[in-house]
Amino acid sequence: MNFDYNKVIPIKGDASFRKFYRKKIKKKSSIIVYAEKEKIKNLLNYDSINQLLLKKNVSAPRLLSENFSQNFIEIEDFGKKTLFDILKTKRNNKFKIYKKILVTLIKLQNIKVKKIKNFKKKFYKIPIYSKSLLLKEVNLFFEWYIPHIFNKKKRFKIDSQLKKVTSSLLKKIKLPNNTFVHRDFHVSNLMLKKKVISVIDSQDAVYGNMAYDLASLIDDVRLRTSKNMKEMIYQEYLYLNKKKINIKKFKNDFEILSVLRNLKIIGIFSRLANRDNKKQYLKLIPYAWELIELRVKDNDIFKDLKKNLEANFPKKIRFKK
């Protein structure tokens, strides 16, 4: 298959290096995923995870054709509306949609396969979401956000203090890395296909903490939800999940992972703005700070983090637009 720019329509991409195009022939359409950079992850691994999801009865894009040497694959088209688009405009019954999302999440978490074959007939082993990888992600906050807020002298002091705090939080995570984690499980990566929730953007999947994807869904920086809605989703997950869960450990990990994830996101959005000139992501940073505040406010485990953030990141910095 050849990729003809004249026969495809560019569509809005995401925060990755990929480009997306819609190909239309008569009444049929498909999506071209183009990736020159990180093509193993963005093409090979992406399709491998999709095939695994499909085998486990989770709706995901099917591979229609591939031309890896030319940096693209062709996949099934799920349309233009994500669950983000639906929830953003929906006034009633939002919780009903979230309940369906949680059913999909639990199906994902029941996946146990760790080695899969890609379309090049080579095996791909799904990595472990180790604490060193989590720490590497949190460091994006230090690498990309802090340098644009503080001068070099102050930055060194803040880096040193805050890195100790985030490292100590990682040591307080209790649950094992034995659960399939999408790693970007939020409503912008979920679509409806014939009333069935479909999962996209799965190339970064790992085996990690069972609280991670729930934290990603509930404390989603792209979509504001009330504190009450967040708690309802959290309790519904506990109700639906038939596994024996240590509630105290789970809550502990949920809140730590949410905070660390949103620090990472602040770093990623700063990188997108300053390196890639995608300034639109900056407007989401104040809400990421709100989500961090929500989790650290009433939990003693964040005592040192709260003290550090209040001393170094006053509201005029956090909520600067």
What are these regions (language model features)?
Residues 26, 69, 75-90, 123, ...:
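A glycine-centered beta->alpha junction motif in the catalytic cores
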